Swiss-Prot record:
Residue positions binding GTP: 404-411, 450-454, 504-507
Residue spans of biased composition, Acidic residues class: 114-128
Protein name (Swiss-Prot/TrEMBL): Translation initiation factor IF-2
Cross-referenced NCBIfam families: IF-2, small_GTP
Biased composition (Low complexity): 55-72
G3: annotated segments: 450-453
GO cellular component: cytosol
Role noted for this protein: One of the essential components for the initiation of protein synthesis. Protects formylmethionyl-tRNA from spontaneous hydrolysis and promotes its binding to the 30S ribosomal subunits. Also involved in the hydrolysis of GTP during the formation of the 70S ribosomal complex.
Lineage, uppermost ranks: Bacteria, Pseudomonadati, Chlamydiota, Chlamydiia, Chlamydiales
Chain residue ranges for the region called G1: 404-411
GO function terms (MF aspect): GTP binding; GTPase activity; translation initiation factor activity
Chain ranges of the tr-type G domain: 395-564
Length: 890
């Protein structure tokens, strides 16, 4: 290790010398070297104290000096194996002769010369032998171990500790107590003695006796450390120090706790659970919280408004905030008058809001500006046309709706007018969608609406009556006026629309127009043939009889009505039908009532908006603009609009989006209140519930199905429609039906190809229909299947027990005689005693003599074995009966 240190020392000196030369400090270094050489000569003449001590030690040893001198060259040769061996191969006398010369630090003089570098190493090596013999020969001398040469150069020599000066007590420097502060602190805060472990190889610390003044007589370093520990209050630990005298006044610690709680009696609190009390009683000191008194508001100082303006709907909490009241005060006032509300309930009645304002002396005005903005227009189409400048109005085509009972020939009559064959393509030979056509006739263009005649499509008929100008009431001449015919008449009268009666099927032999006239007169529609004002035309859809006369009557009615519209205005109309197309997305058939609809215009419906991307007529021809009374199929909608929804053209798509977002936000506000509450009556009555999910091709079909299902009344089964939407049955629909245990009903729609395997794996029941009354009948059957069948017991025969035979293998065998009817094996049996039923079970074995038989008739004896019953007695009656299950009715 010493060789390595010496080598490092040499390298360090060489590097320092090179840096010195590069910095241009050679001349300064030479002057310093000359000055150092002169000092070295003087020091060589006068030996140092260290050399004297070494000589004394060598003289005292028993070994001769020659042996020590012989040992030094060996150690020198053993330590130094330098780069140039020739310089160290001299004799002992030569090496000793170099010692006084090399102590004068010749390194700065000869930087580039390698020989003086080795002489410097020789000097270092010559000093080391002086130390080691002393440490080995005189181990008992209290001489401090000498540091190696490298450490001598890097570290300063330790300064000899000065003797501690005695403290002179000056009375003027004492405090008011007459004692020095050191005495007070030393006595009051005496650190406890700590056991110090003596580690092998480390310096041993011995206790030093204190002097007369009471100060510990330690060395300078130890005294300084102890003084810092005693006099520094920050290093003190109150818990570890000795107990203070309770009689003396504490001058330093402001957290004195005279009363110590017993640790064994301390309760376990939440702070102990989280480890906050581990430090003991002293460490749990916390700063006392500053008490802040609550602010008491003087109600008299609050100025409540006497007039406010709000918009409906509004919650009870918001209304109370506007009136500077507490919500509890408003709720209390409502409760006193029999109205139960909570904080988040919504007030949508203007009367209730005005009543609250009257009770608290505040006038409340309702702001309708936001509703007007969302409504777009409060005027109807007719009012809008009447308010338009007459110079802008032009004559438009009449909108004619064909209405009547199912199978009375409405669609066939329209096909004859249009010269088409729509009726042949309809499922079940009935119309289940509303169709809109624009056909050219000899008397002009006519827009025709074909409405369904089935009872389920009453909403479609009502919608057709609202949008049309003339109603053609189709009545079959061989059947007369039916239920749906009367309903269509009511819709037409409610809309104040002109009615033209077409008595169809006049080519049939049992056609009787007089019967139709009589029925019309009974419902206040007196025909012209009987002197009334109702126009009647006998027609035949198959032969074409009366069609031209019917068209003339329609043209005459249109002239009388003076139908006009403004084609320059923004388009406004009604949704006839809507559906989800596979490639086009949501599409809608709309009828324009006023204005003109163009490509790229933005539309607003009730629940959705859109921008017209494409527009087609009934012949699938692309159109760029559609005027009044023209039905078109449009695409580019955000969602499927509901049939019958009005639409308006707005400035741009952003405006349309903002209007719909505002409407949806208002609808979400009522979502919680509109949720269906659980029917506790059905729960108490233990009613069954049928859950349905409806998928249809168009929105009108969904309306018809939902309306028909709601008309199914049952005291035993409730029907709950979970979802109803337009489109094919998808995978998500099947998963939802499986999770909710619902039945999927598809009307005029199919199942997606990748969703079909999921139906079998999840076990979901899916029913597809193309005719609506087939769907209604199937739903009724499903409702009936949910009901448990009614069990009926039908008596077959009876037998009397005459004898009882005991068997260790099968138990009791009853010997009986059949008194009535037939006793049949494996049928149910009742055991009666004194006309009281004791047991019901199964007749497991029936024998006649020793043979097993299936049945035994009246008057014959038999052996009967009952399954699981051995307590029958002689004289008991066994009644045989059969259980028959009957399905319940809705």
């Amino acid at each position: 290790m010493e060789k390595v240190k010496l080598t490092k020392n040499l390298k360090l000196k060489i590097k320092n010398a090179q840096l010195t030369k590069a910095a241009g400090l050679d001349k300064l270094k030479q002057k310093l070297a000359q000055a150092g050489s002169s000092e070295a000569k003087s020091s060589s003449e006068k030996p140092s104290a260290k050399e004297k001590s070494v000589k004394v030690a060598l003289a005292a040893t028993s070994t001769p000096t020659a042996s020590a001198e012989q040992a030094s060259p060996e150690s020198t040769s053993r330590r130094i194996r330098a780069k140039n061996r020739s310089s160290f191969s001299s004799s002992e006398e030569e090496s000793s002769a170099h010692i006084p010369v090399d102590t004068s630090e010749p390194a700065p003089v000869s930087i580039a010369d390698p020989e003086p570098e080795l002489e410097v190493v020789d000097e270092v090596c010559d000093e080391s032998p002086e130390v080691h013999p002393v440490a080995e020969v005189l181990p008992e001398q209290p001489v401090l171990p000498e540091t190696p040469p490298q450490e001598k150069e890097l570290e300063p020599k330790p300064v000899k500790p000065a003797e501690p000066k005695s403290v002179v007590m000056i009375k003027s420097k004492f405090g008011p107590t007459g004692k020095h502060i050191n005495h007070l602190l030393a006595k009051t805060f005496k650190a406890p003695a700590k056991e110090e472990k003596v580690v092998a190889g480390s310096k041993s610390t011995k206790p030093v006796a204190s002097d007369k003044t009471g100060k510990p007589g330690t060395s300078e370093g130890g005294e300084q450390n102890n003084r810092e520990k005693q006099f520094n209050p920050a290093n003190r630990s109150p818990a570890s120090g000795p107990k203070r005298d309770a009689g003396k006044k504490n001058l330093t610690d402001f957290r004195d706790r005279s009363k110590k709680s017993d640790e064994s009696l301390k309760a376990f609190t939440g702070r102990d659970r989280y480890g906050l009390n581990e430090g003991g009683e002293e460490d749990r000191w916390r700063k006392k919280r500053v008490y802040k008194p609550k602010k008491h508001y003087d109600e008299a100082s609050i100025q409540r408004p006497t007039h406010i303006k709000i918009s409906l709907p509004i919650t009870v909490k918001d209304l109370a905030t506007e009136m500077k009241l507490k919500a509890s005060e408003v709720i209390q006032k409502l409760f006193i008058h029999g109205m139960t509300y909570v904080v988040n309930d919504i007030l949508d009645s203007e009367t209730a809001v005005q009543f609250i304002g009257l009770e608290f002396g505040c006038t409340i005005d309702i702001d309708y500006s936001e509703q007007d903005k969302l409504c777009l227009s409060n005027d109807t189409v007719r009012d809008e046309i009447q308010s338009t400048d007459p110079s802008k109005l032009v004559i438009r085509s009449p909108i004619v709706a064909f209405m009547g009972h199912v199978d009375h020939g409405k669609t066939t009559l329209i096909d004859s007018l249009r010269k088409s064959n729509v009726a042949a393509t309809e499922a079940g030979a009935i119309t289940q969608h509303m169709g809109a056509f624009c056909c050219s006739t000899p008397v002009g263009d006519i827009t025709i609406l074909d409405t369904p005649g089935h009872e389920a499509f009453s909403a479609m008929r009502a919608r057709g009556a609202e949008v049309c100008d003339i109603v053609v009431l189709v009545v079959a001449g061989d059947e007369g006026i039916k239920e749906q015919t009367l309903e269509a008449i009511e819709h037409a009268k409610a809309a104040d629309i002109a009615i033209v009666v077409a008595i169809n099927k006049c080519d049939k032999p049992n056609f009787n127009s007089e019967t139709i006239y009589r029925q019309l007169s009974e419902i206040n529609l007196l025909p012209e043939a009987w002197g009334g004002s109702t126009v009647t035309v006998n027609t035949s859809a198959k032969t074409g009889e009366g069609l031209s006369e019917l068209l003339e009557m329609l043209a005459l009615q249109a002239e009388v009505l003076e139908l006009k519209a403004d084609p320059s205005a923004r388009a406004r109309g009604l949704v006839i039908e809507s559906e989800l197309h596979k490639g086009l997305g949501p599409v809608a058939t709309v009828l324009i009532q006023n204005g003109s609809l163009k490509l790229g215009e933005a539309l607003v419906f009730n629940d959705c908006y859109g921008k017209v991307k494409t527009m087609h007529n009934e012949h699938n021809e692309l159109m760029k603009e559609a005027g009044p009374s023209i039905p078109v199929l449009i695409t580019g909608l955000s969602d499927i609009p509901k049939a019958g929804d009005p639409f308006f053209v707005v400035k741009n798509e952003k405006t349309a989006r903002d209007i719909i977002e505002a409407r949806s936000a208002g609808q979400q506000r009522f979502a919680l209140q509109q949720k269906k509450r659980p029917n506790f009556d059905s729960m108490l009555q233990n009613k069954k519930t049928l859950k349905l999910m409806i998928k249809a091709d168009v929105q009108g079909s969904i309306e018809a199905l939902v309306s028909s299902i709601s008309k199914i009344k049952s005291e035993k089964v409730d029907v709950e429609i979970l979802t109803n939407s337009v489109g094919e049955i998808s995978e998500s629909d099947i998963r939802l039906a499986a999770a909710s245990k619902a039945v999927l009903i598809g009307f005029h729609t199919g199942i997606e190809s990748h969703a079909e395997p999921l139906i079998k794996s999840l076990g979901v029941r899916v029913e597809l229909f193309t005719v609506i009354y087939h769907a209604i009948d199937a739903i009724k059957e499903i409702m009936t299947s949910l009901l448990d069948p009614i069990a009926e017991e039908k008596d077959e025969g009876s037998a009397e027990i005459k004898e009882i035979f005991r068997s260790s293998q099968v138990g009791s065998i009853y010997g009986c005689i059949v008194t009535e009817g037939i006793m049949t094996r494996n049928h149910k049996v009742r055991v009666l005693r004194n006309k009281e039923i004791l047991w019901k079970g199964t007749l497991s074995s029936l024998k006649r003599v020793k043979e097993d038989v299936k049945e035994v008739r009246k008057g014959l004896e038999c052996g009967i074995l009952l399954e699981g019953y051995q307590q029958a007695q002689i004289g008991d009656v066994l009644q045989c009966y059969e259980v028959i299950y009957h399905p319940q009715k809705l």
